[in-house]
A protein has these predicted regions:
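Start-transfer (signal-anchor) and selected internal transmembrane alpha helices
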Residues: 1-42, 51, 147-151
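Coil-to-alpha-helix initiation sites in intrinsically disordered, low-complexity, charged segments
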Residues: 2-5, 68, 88-93, 197, ...
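Extracellular/lumenal inter-transmembrane loop segments of multi-pass membrane transporters
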Residues: 7, 100-107, 139-144
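Interfacial helix-loop-helix linkers and transmembrane-helix boundary segments
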Residues: 9-12, 72-75, 133, 169-172
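Membrane-interfacial loop-to-helix junctions in multi-pass transporters
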Residues: 12-15, 105-109, 147-148, 199-203
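Membrane-embedded helix bundles of polyisoprenyl
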Residues: 24-27, 118-196, 200-241
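Membrane-interface coil-to-helix junctions
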Residues: 25-126, 173
């Protein structure tokens, strides 16, 4: 009886503990391959079998060493080189910032190792963002139903096989960061859409715009945000859910 009373009083705490466990399971699965990412010939770390991450790593190493990215990359599109202003550079900067944090805490001795851990760390934040988004979708339900649905959805999200290759350790791809910004954009949009006070709608709308802009600095797939939000607003207008 005491246990039941405790659970009733601490329902929110129980939900967040379950969420933490779900995220832990997801991150654990995504770090099982780390021991395989060490080059047995040199004893140094290397990224997984993907092409783009090596470019992002090289740029991140340059940023860590020099403070900012070069304007012209002579190693890309040889012999003409490549104007880095034409590429989405935020990912490499985020890897560099992540390395600076880990190295300060003595948790990483190389940019490569930090890049290996980076997609897993971003996945944890993405899972949290997805939980908030899923919970907000069912904002009209009571708290128990909202949290339960969001937890089940998050569990399926962290275990879905198609997401694993883009969020696993050693593959610092654009999607590992972009998904976080995407779900936060959706979450803030729903907050703005459902808020009863104009000032809060404005604040959340601005935050949704910022998240969308940050996603655009990482991944061209930000167009999904435009399509999703515009379609949702159009359908709501047709169903007379929006007062004009």
């Amino acid at each position: 009886k005491k246990l039941i009373d405790f659970i009733k009083r601490k329902k929110d705490l129980i939900f967040y503990l379950i969420l933490a466990f779900i995220i832990f399971i997801g991150t654990y699965i995504r770090t099982l391959n780390i021991s395989k990412l060490k080059d047995i010939t040199t004893g140094t770390w290397t990224l997984g079998p993907d092409l783009d991450p090596f470019l992002f790593l090289r740029w991140a190493e340059y940023i860590v060493k020099n403070g900012s990215l070069m304007a012209h990359d002579a190693m890309r599109n040889v012999p003409l080189g490549f104007d880095t202003a034409g590429e989405m550079k935020l990912l490499s900067y985020m890897i560099a910032w992540f390395h600076n944090i880990l190295s300060t805490l003595s948790l990483s001795d190389s940019v490569t190792y930090s890049a290996i851990l980076f997609p897993v760390a971003m996945f944890a934040f993405t899972a949290l963002a997805f939980f908030l988004f899923a919970k907000k979708v069912f904002y009209k339900e009571n708290k128990l139903i909202r949290n339960s649905i969001a937890l089940i959805a998050t569990l399926l999200f962290v275990l879905v096989p198609s997401l694993l290759p883009r969020t696993i350790a050693g593959i610092p791809e654009k999607e590992s960061v972009a998904f976080f910004f995407m779900f936060m954009a959706f979450y803030f949009f729903l907050e703005a859409f459902t808020s009863e006070k104009f000032k809060f709608s404005l604040i959340y709308g601005v935050l949704a715009g910022i998240m969308t802009g940050l996603m655009a600095l990482v991944w061209g797939g930000m167009i999904f945000v435009f399509f999703t939000i515009s379609s949702a607003v159009l359908i709501s207008f047709i169903l007379e859910k929006i007062k004009v």
